[in-house]
C-alpha cells in the first residue's frame, strides 16, 4: 500500500492485492480499499516514491478510467503523465460519446444524450464559463468546445476540453469583431477556427478569418461575397482539407481551402427529380471514412414533400441517392419545423446523420450502418416553456485533444 499526496490535499491510498487480473490488481480509496479481496500489504513508501515512470505508467494503465481522472488532482507529475501523448496512445480507453444540447437559457450545464445506452446525463461547466457562455457555445470538434466570451461584445473565444478541464482564451484579431459561421476544425497537429468577419459598415465586403493553434495567429482572406450571399446561416462541413457549404437557391456546392483560403464552386452532378426543386440542402461528413453526405428536401413552390440523403462520389464528382425518409416521418418533421427550412440543420455523430430543428427539442437521425431511422426523445429535464433555440452538437470526449 502506498499513498499519493498533493500539498494541502487528502491522500489517496493505492492498495495492492494478491490477485493479478487487470480489474482487481489495484484498488484505491481516500484511506483504504474496502473492496480489496485480500488483506493489503504495507509497502515501503521510500521505494514507491522512487518508482520509475515506466512502472508507474503500467500500474496506472490497470486502473479504471474514472480513477485516473481522480488521480489527476494529486500532483502535476501524475497529471502530466496521465495526459501525456505516449500514455494515451499506448493505452486505449473506451469513452462514451454524446449528443450535447445547448440552449440560450441554460447557463451552468449541458444535457448529454448517450445513443448507445439511450440515457441522459449532465455536463457541468466550470465557473469561469458557466456564468456567461452556456448560451454561446459556437462549435465542437474531437472533444473540444468553442465558446464566445462576453457575448455582448465578443472580445475573445475560449477553447475548452471538458475531460481534461483545460481551456485557452483566444483573443480575436480586432474589437469589435462581428462574425458569423464559426467552425472549429481539429487535427492531430492542433486545430483551426474558421469564421466570416466584416467591418461595422454594412456595405463592406466580408473576409475569411482563420486561426491556427500551431502558431496562434489569425490570417485573413477575401472572396467570400462572390460565393456565399449575406444571410447564409449554415455552418461549413470539413471534408478533405476544406470547409464545404451547400446552397439551395440555386443549388450550389462551394468550398474554401483551410490552408490558402481559396474558394471553389461546383454544382455537383446528381440524379435529382427533374420536375421538383431542392427546397433545402445540408451537408454532413464522416471523418473516419472520409465520406461527404447531403441531406436535401425535395418539393415544389418552397414546400418539402420528401427528404433524401445523397452520398458524394469523389471519383466521378457526382451525388448518388442512398436513402429516402419514410413519408410518415417526413410529414412529422416538416410539421414541427413549420416548413421554415432555415431552422433545419444537420450534423454527423458516430455513424449517425442527425437532422435537427432549432425550434424542436428532439433529433431525427439515420443510422448509416443499420440503415434505420430513429428519434432522440426530448430531454426529461428541459422546462416546458423552452420552445426554440435548441442547438445540438456532437461531443466525443478525448484525452488527447489539446487546447
Curated annotation (Swiss-Prot):
PROSITE patterns: FBOX. Residues 45-91 form the F-box domain. Pfam families: Beta-prop_KIB1-4, F-box. Keywords: Kelch repeat, Repeat. Kelch repeats lie at residues 91-140, 192-240, 291-339, 343-393. The keyword DNA-binding does not apply. PANTHER family: BNACNNG10540D PROTEIN, F-BOX DOMAIN-CONTAINING PROTEIN. This is F-box/kelch-repeat protein At5g43190. It comes from Arabidopsis thaliana.
Amino acid at each position: 500500500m502506498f499513498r499519493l499526496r498533493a500539498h494541502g490535499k487528502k491522500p489517496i491510498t493505492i492498495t495492492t492485492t494478491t490477485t493479478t487480473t487487470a480489474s482487481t490488481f489495484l484498488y484505491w480509496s481516500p484511506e483504504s480499499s474496502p473492496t480489496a479481496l485480500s488483506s493489503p500489504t504495507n509497502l515501503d513508501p521510500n521505494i514507491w516514491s522512487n518508482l520509475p515512470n515506466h512502472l508507474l505508467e503500467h500500474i496506472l494503465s490497470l486502473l479504471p478510467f474514472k480513477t485516473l481522472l481522480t488521480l489527476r488532482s494529486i500532483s502535476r507529475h501524475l497529471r502530466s503523465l496521465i495526459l501525456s501523448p505516449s500514455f494515451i496512445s499506448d493505452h486505449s480507453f473506451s469513452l462514451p460519446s454524446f449528443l450535447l444540447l445547448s440552449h440560450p437559457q441554460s447557463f451552468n450545464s449541458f444535457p448529454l444524450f448517450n445513443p448507445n445506452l439511450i440515457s441522459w446525463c449532465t455536463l457541468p461547466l466550470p465557473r469561469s464559463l458557466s456564468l456567461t457562455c452556456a448560451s454561446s457555445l459556437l462549435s465542437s470538434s474531437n472533444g473540444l468546445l468553442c465558446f464566445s466570451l462576453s457575448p455582448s461584445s465578443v472580445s475573445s473565444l475560449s477553447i475548452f476540453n471538458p475531460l481534461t478541464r483545460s481551456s485557452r482564451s483566444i483573443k480575436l484579431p480586432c474589437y469589435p469583431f462581428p462574425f458569423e459561421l464559426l467552425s472549429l476544425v481539429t487535427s492531430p497537429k492542433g486545430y483551426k477556427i474558421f469564421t466570416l468577419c466584416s467591418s461595422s459598415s454594412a456595405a463592406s465586403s466580408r473576409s475569411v478569418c482563420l486561426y491556427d493553434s500551431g502558431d496562434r495567429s489569425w490570417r485573413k482572406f477575401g472572396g467570400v461575397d462572390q460565393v456565399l450571399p449575406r444571410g447564409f446561416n449554415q455552418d461549413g462541413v470539413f471534408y478533405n482539407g476544406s470547409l464545404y457549404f451547400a446552397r439551395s437557391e440555386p443549388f450550389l456546392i462551394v468550398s474554401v481551402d483551410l490552408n490558402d483560403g481559396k474558394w471553389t464552386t461546383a454544382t455537383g452532378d446528381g440524379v435529382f427529380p427533374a420536375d421538383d426543386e431542392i427546397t433545402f440542402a445540408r451537408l454532413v461528413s464522416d471523418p473516419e471514412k472520409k465520406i461527404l453526405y447531403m441531406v436535401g428536401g425535395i418539393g415544389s413552390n418552397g414546400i418539402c414533400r420528401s427528404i433524401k440523403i445523397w452520398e458524394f462520389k469523389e471519383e466521378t464528382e457526382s451525388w448518388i441517392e442512398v436513402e429516402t425518409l419514410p413519408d410518415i416521418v417526413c410529414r412529422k418533421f416538416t410539421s414541427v419545423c413549420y416548413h421554415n427550412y432555415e431552422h433545419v440543420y444537420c450534423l454527423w455523430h458516430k455513424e449517425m446523420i442527425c437532422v435537427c430543428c432549432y425550434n424542436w427539442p428532439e433529433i431525427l437521425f439515420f443510422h448509416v450502418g443499420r440503415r434505420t431511422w430513429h428519434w432522440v426523445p426530448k430531454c426529461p429535464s428541459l422546462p416546458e416553456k423552452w420552445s426554440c433555440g435548441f442547438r445540438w452538437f456532437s461531443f466525443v470526449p478525448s484525452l488527447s485533444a489539446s487546447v
